[in-house]
């Protein structure tokens, strides 16, 4: 049980990193998606995760592959 909890506390998405690479802000992304900036902020801190449909939208807006928005499970041990 402890192992599962530790795994869940690790970062899942790379949104903050990708936004920085693209020189874009949380606010810009929120506007593009029609989402609340507070929600996008929670995604960036991995407090919450976007659903899969939203992840695809984010990838399109940022012109990246969806896999670029997620940390590799292999690297996240």
Model feature map: region roles:
Residues 53-68:
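DNA major-groove recognition helix of helix-turn-helix/homeodomain DNA-binding modules
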Residues 1-25:
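A short, Lys/Arg-rich alpha-helix, primarily the initiator
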Residues 24, 50-53:
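Residue-level signal for the short linker/turn that defines the boundary of a DNA-recognition helix
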Residues 23-42:
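Short alpha-helical DNA-recognition segment
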Residues 68-77:
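Short amphipathic recognition helices of helix-turn-helix/homeodomain-type DNA-binding modules
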Residues 19, 30, 59:
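The alpha-helix within a helix-turn-helix
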Residues 20, 34, 45-47, 74:
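Residue-level detection of the helix-turn-helix DNA-binding "recognition helix"
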């Amino acid at each position: 049980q402890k192992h599962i909890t530790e795994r869940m506390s690790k970062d899942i998405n790379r949104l903050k990193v990708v936004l920085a690479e693209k020189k874009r802000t949380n606010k810009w992304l929120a506007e593009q998606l029609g989402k609340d900036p507070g929600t996008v902020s929670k995604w960036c801190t991995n407090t919450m995760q976007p659903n899969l449909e939203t992840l695809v939208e984010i990838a399109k807006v940022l012109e990246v592959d969806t896999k670029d928005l997620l940390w590799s499970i292999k690297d996240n041990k």
